A protein has these predicted regions:
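Acidic, metal-coordinating helix/loop segments flanking the phosphotransfer/catalytic sites
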Residues: 40-58
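Short amphipathic alpha-helix used as the core "switch/output" element in two-component signaling
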Residues: 68-82
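Active-site residues of response regulator receiver
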Residues: 62
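Conserved acidic carboxylate
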Residues: 17
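Hydrophobic/aromatic residues positioned on beta-strands within the core alpha/beta folds
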Residues: 87-88
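Non-catalytic signal-transmission and effector/linker regions of two-component phosphorelay proteins
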Residues: 1-12, 109-124
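Two-component/phosphorelay signaling modules centered on CheY-like receiver
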Residues: 20-39
Length: 124
């Protein structure tokens, strides 16, 4: 019985989300659409460390980490010229300086995640 070949991994991602269950779900979704999660972070400090120590092509950022804005992480990514996508449960992620960045409003479907990642990767 033949099995379907798995798609080649397209890119390595940094996943920044403070809710462990959402982070696990996002990691599974990213794997399903062919991306490799290079590192995960649950806090701003962990995310900043990952930006310094991990090789990745794109970041998925929860806009609010335990009540703190993720803007220091976004600033670090801009300095390294690495694209990112915001995910948020709010209507507005509150990061005016980054209003032009792709944003997914939770909950979202896997197809929306795939389109958003592809778009963010192609623009960087």
């Amino acid at each position: 019985m033949a099995t379907e070949a798995q798609p080649a991994k397209q890119a390595k991602l940094l996943l920044v989300e403070d809710d462990v269950l959402i982070r696990m779900l996002l990691a599974d979704m990213l794997d399903e659409i062919g991306y490799t999660v290079a590192a995960e972070a649950a806090s701003i400090d962990e995310a900043l460390e990952a930006t310094r120590k991990t090789d990745f092509d794109l970041a998925i950022l929860d806009a609010d980490l335990d009540g703190r804005s993720v803007s220091p992480v976004a600033d670090a990514l801009v300095a390294r010229d690495i694209g990112f996508v915001f995910v948020t449960g709010y209507d507005d992620h509150g990061l005016f300086a980054y209003r032009d960045r792709p944003t997914l409003k939770k909950p979202f479907q896997i197809d929306a995640l795939k389109r958003c990642c592809k778009s963010a990767l192609s623009s960087h």
